[in-house]
């Protein structure tokens, strides 16, 4: 980010957060107009602490199956300041408890797995309302992953729109062109902006290339002017 002007890449402040709607995971993209927002930072700090607590519980459960992973082991896998189940899987591979990340999730880390631990998640509607109160821009991320379609997806969009939803992520690498068009129609119907991207997650998703998907200059300008 320090080389933003030098390499001629414009950065925008934002985060992705996981929320819940009727027991389904709903992902939201939050674009911030300010670099720092005290209320948002306080919420993120709370969520970070809850994530650490969840991680510690998962590690405790893994001990029952002779998979001994310490927080120090995990730190070797983490480049940022957030620990995820993917990092736990990497640590399990490094110590020889599993052969692959897929095996770690299938047996231990997936929802319902031997060492699974439920996440404390925000309510989707309350999250959008909060984002708008702090002056952020809220976009429904990769709607395909909600598992909703047709009328049920439209109902969710209506409810989120009532709370101030600004956009839908219509461009996403793991969906068909037909699905992209469906999400564009939803945006046009409810006066929402288009967002999109490659959903790059570093080496956790090595097959997804940074910048492989994105929005046009015109679509970006609309978001900036929101």
Model-derived features: where do they sit?
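Domain-core and long-helix interface of multi-subunit machines
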Residues: 53-191
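Residues in flexible loops and secondary-structure boundaries
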Residues: 19, 36-38, 116-117, 218, ...
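Structural recognition of alpha->loop->beta junctions
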Residues: 156-171, 210-226
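Flexible, active-site-adjacent loop/turn segments at secondary-structure boundaries
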Residues: 95, 103-107, 198, 208, ...
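A metal-dependent hydrolase metal-coordination microenvironment
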Residues: 1-83, 163, 169-190, 194-205, ...
């Amino acid at each position: 980010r320090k080389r933003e002007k030098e390499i001629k890449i414009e950065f925008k402040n934002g985060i992705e957060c996981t929320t819940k709607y009727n027991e389904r995971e709903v992902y939201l993209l939050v674009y911030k107009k300010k670099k720092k927002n005290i209320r948002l930072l306080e919420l993120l700090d709370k969520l970070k602490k809850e994530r650490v607590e969840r991680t510690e519980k998962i590690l405790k459960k893994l001990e029952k199956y002779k998979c001994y992973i310490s927080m120090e082991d995990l730190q070797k896998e983490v480049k940022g300041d957030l620990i995820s189940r993917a990092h736990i899987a990497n640590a399990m591979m490094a110590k020889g408890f599993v052969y692959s990340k897929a095996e770690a999730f299938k047996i231990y880390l997936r929802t319902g797995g031997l060492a699974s631990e439920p996440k404390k998640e925000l309510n989707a509607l309350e999250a959008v309302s909060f984002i708008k109160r702090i002056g952020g821009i809220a976009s429904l991320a990769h709607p395909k992953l909600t598992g909703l379609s047709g009328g049920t997806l439209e109902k969710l969009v209506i409810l989120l729109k009532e709370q101030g939803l600004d956009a839908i992520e219509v461009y996403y690498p793991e969906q068909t062109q037909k699905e992209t068009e469906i999400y564009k129609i939803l945006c046009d119907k409810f006066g929402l902006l288009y967002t999109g991207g490659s959903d790059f997650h570093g080496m956790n998703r090595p097959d997804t290339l940074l910048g492989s998907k994105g929005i046009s200059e015109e679509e970006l300008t609309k978001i900036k002017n929101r």
